[in-house]
């Protein structure tokens, strides 16, 4: 399953998590999920699904798109963890 995080963002409103999916997958599986997501985004509607819920999301013609790479370092062990995030954001 693909992790896609989306927000109907308002500056003064608290964040409400509407959907989350997370699983270890191969690079090939992740790439296939991203291709599928890209095709759905291009149509303007994306279907999010996991084992317990399903949700359709309409994406406007010109949302904001953010790419972020983070490195988090454990202060005790020095172990580094990386997070690559793609985020689509818009207001309604």
Where do the model's predicted regions map?
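Terminal, regulation- and interaction-focused segments at domain boundaries
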Residues: 2-37, 43
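Intrinsic, low-complexity terminal and presequence regions
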Residues: 4, 8-9, 60, 83-90
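Short, structured protein-protein interaction patches enriched in aromatics and acidic/basic residues
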Residues: 21, 42-72
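Short, low-complexity, charged amphipathic interaction modules
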Residues: 30, 35-41, 45-52, 80-88
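Generic marker of residues within folded, mature protein domains
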Residues: 38, 57, 76-78
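C-terminal edge-of-domain segments
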Residues: 69-92
């Amino acid at each position: 399953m693909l992790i896609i995080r989306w927000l109907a963002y308002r500056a003064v409103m608290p964040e409400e998590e509407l959907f989350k999916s997370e699983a270890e997958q191969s690079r090939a599986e992740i790439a296939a999920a991203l291709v599928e997501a890209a095709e759905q985004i291009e149509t303007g509607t994306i279907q999010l699904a996991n084992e317990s819920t399903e949700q359709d999301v309409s994406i406007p013609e010109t949302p904001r798109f953010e790419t972020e790479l983070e490195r988090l370092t454990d202060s005790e062990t020095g172990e580094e963890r990386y997070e690559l995030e793609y985020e689509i954001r818009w207001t309604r």
